[in-house]
Amino acid sequence: MKFQIYQVDAFAENVFEGNPACVVPLKKWLSDNLLLQIAKENAVAETAFFIDEGDCINLRWFTPDIEIDLCGHATLATACILKRVLKYSSETIKFRTLSGELKVTYSNDLFLLDFP
């Protein structure tokens, strides 16, 4: 099994600053236990896992111990990977999460999260 893992330092312009999060794009969901094991191995506060559903992105967050309902910096990190690495075309990214729909807009090289 292979997948890409990105580490993003949210709220920072330089490496080793800001709030780190790992971002893992998936084609299909892995078991909750495997997602948790990956998050533990990453050893950062939160790991974001996502699946691109076309009209929205299904997004889940895990700490090294549990799945959590909401994580702002890991959502922004995911948006950053979608736009800058995976070349997601829309300026607004809709995320489907345990906390409902979240939107991140990319404008003037900034990511703006509509936080509930």
Question: PLM features: residue spans?
Answer:
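N-terminal, positively charged, Ser/Thr/Ala/Gly-biased leader segments
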Residues: 1-16
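Short, low-complexity Ser/Thr-rich regulatory SLiMs
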Residues: 12, 51-52, 106-108
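Generic N-terminal amphipathic, Lys/Arg-enriched alpha-helix
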Residues: 14-24
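Short beta-strand-to-turn element immediately C-terminal to the catalytic PLP-Schiff-base lysine
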Residues: 23-26, 50-51
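Anion-binding (especially nucleotide phosphate/pyrophosphate-binding) glycine-rich loop
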Residues: 34-68
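Acidic, low-complexity central loop/insert segments
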Residues: 56, 62-116
